[in-house]
Swiss-Prot record:
Gene assigned in the entry: hpsN
Native organism: Ruegeria pomeroyi (strain ATCC 700808 / DSM 15171 / DSS-3) (Silicibacter pomeroyi)
Top-level taxon in the UniProt lineage: Bacteria
Organism phylogeny: Bacteria, Pseudomonadati, Pseudomonadota, Alphaproteobacteria, Rhodobacterales
Cofactor note as given: Binds 1 zinc ion per subunit.
Name under which the protein is recorded: Sulfopropanediol 3-dehydrogenase
Positions with a binding annotation for Zn(2+): 249, 252, 353, 412
């Protein structure tokens, strides 16, 4: 059976993408040339904010005092889960040594980058969870200086809950600046801060483009597009839960794709029927986003069986992948292309987005086919080292000289020759290239 689209997207994120490169390139160039003052000018223009950029300890304390105790407890709960998961990830990175030949020791070390810049969105929604996800993971990795920047609200500043989350999760500096100017401030080391060695966190198309342009000068977690989600559901799935989860992810933005892949026509048709009323029940801003995302970007796909469903999912390589079907272990073993996987009706992407412990900074736009999401590993440099005895390196030197000459790299060969001549003056070696 060829897959059947019961609903097909009329747009794709690529067809919707506007050309922001010129704008971002100009802002980055202006800020790099003009420094702090130009960044302040852009903050006043775009954020309509003229307060302190670097929050003082007193400002942090005042902001934290505004956060209700129940919300503080929830943030601490989420932070603890993310921290413990990140610590478990870090434990998989062990320093190793191997004696490749007698007398030559090679090794691997994992070294955290010195300074991390965490972008925390604060526009339409105050992304408290993004502060938790990015700052906590950088702290566990061992970064010496962690910066968190977030767009301030005019006359208000950064949302107090974001300040509280960034503070308790380990941010050394909290900045009231967003957009390209926020990313640039961290990358260029403005306002007396160290230059970020890596930039992480979600953001709008301008933030994503700024990170893309800066990549190479600094590291980045990924180039993120609109968030996307796919649900795999069979006849056992509850259409109410499926519909609720699709709508919950569509509210991210007008161009956030959501996909339902199923082998049960009745389920698919029921979900299509239910979606409009579920969207209509949302608050206005959320409703407008979800309605546009469902209308323009959503798809409902009917497959013959679970193997075809799995193959379809892997082809889409979604950021978020939920399975509501029988035999969850089969799906866990079979599926291979996703940012984060949520198995069973009991799980939901919203848990991962906010508090379950896995990171919500994930690859979008099909990038899950070749990369994973934000983790401790993104903040770490995996470096290698070696040392050895003269005798141990002797066969390595001989092989190096011959390979280098065969490649035409005489300078490399001579670096081996000189050592053999110095350490073994009474021996003769055949170091010619016979290829």
């Amino acid at each position: 059976m060829t897959i059947e689209y019961l609903k097909k997207a009329s747009l794709t994120s690529k067809s919707d993408a506007s050309d922001v490169q010129e704008t971002v390139r100009a802002i980055l160039a202006d800020i790099e040339a003009g420094g702090d003052q130009v960044a302040l000018d852009y903050a006043a223009k775009f954020d309509r904010y003229e307060g302190s950029i670097i929050l003082s300890p007193e400002e942090i304390e005042a902001a934290c005092a505004k956060v209700p105790e129940k919300l503080k407890a929830d943030i601490r709960f989420a932070h603890d889960n993310v921290r413990r998961f990140a610590e478990t990830q870090k434990a998989t990175l062990t320093d190793v040594e191997l004696e490749v030949v007698p007398g030559v020791i090679t090794g691997q070390k994992a070294i955290p980058v010195d300074a991390a810049g965490c972008y925390v969105p604060g526009g339409r929604y105050s992304h408290i969870a993004s502060a938790i996800m990015t700052v906590t993971t950088a702290k566990v990795a061992g970064c010496k200086h962690i910066m968190a920047c977030s767009p301030p609200r005019p006359g208000v500043g950064v949302a107090p809950a974001i300040v509280y989350a960034a503070h308790i999760c380990g941010a050394d500096t909290i900045m009231a600046i967003g957009g390209v100017q926020g990313v640039a401030s961290m990358a260029f080391g403005l306002f007396g801060l160290p230059k970020a060695k890596i930039l992480v966190g979600p953001g709008n198309q301008f933030v994503a483009e700024a990170k893309r342009m800066l990549f190479g000068r600094v590291g980045i977690d990924m180039i993120a597009g609109p968030t996307d989600s796919l649900i795999l559901a069979d006849r056992t799935a509850d259409p109410h839960i499926v519909t609720t989860d699709l709508v919950s992810q569509a509210e991210h933005g007008y161009n956030s794709p959501v996909w339902l892949v199923t082998d049960d026509r009745a389920l698919a048709e029921k979900v299509i029927e239910m979606i409009p009323s579920y969207i209509a029940d949302l608050p206005e801003v959320n409703r407008d986003n979800a309605a546009a995302a469902w209308r323009d970007y959503a798809e409902v796909i009917l497959c013959a069986d679970r193997e075809e469903m799995a193959a379809t999912s892997d082809r889409y390589a979604p950021e978020h992948l939920t399975v509501m079907a029988e035999d969850l272990d089969w799906w866990l073993d079979r599926l291979s292309c996703y940012g984060s996987l949520f198995l069973g009706e009991e799980s939901t992407v919203s848990y991962g987005d906010k508090a379950a412990g896995t990171n919500h900074v994930l690859p979008t736009s099909g990038a899950a086919s070749y990369t994973g999401g934000l983790s401790v590993h993104k903040y770490m440099k995996i470096v290698t080292w070696q040392r050895g005895t003269r005798e141990g390196y002797k066969p390595v030197a001989e092989a190096t000289a011959r390979i280098a000459r065969l490649e035409g790299m005489e300078g490399h060969a001579r670096a081996a020759d000189v050592r053999l001549a110095k350490y073994f003056p009474d021996e003769t070696f055949d170091l010619t290239a016979n290829g």
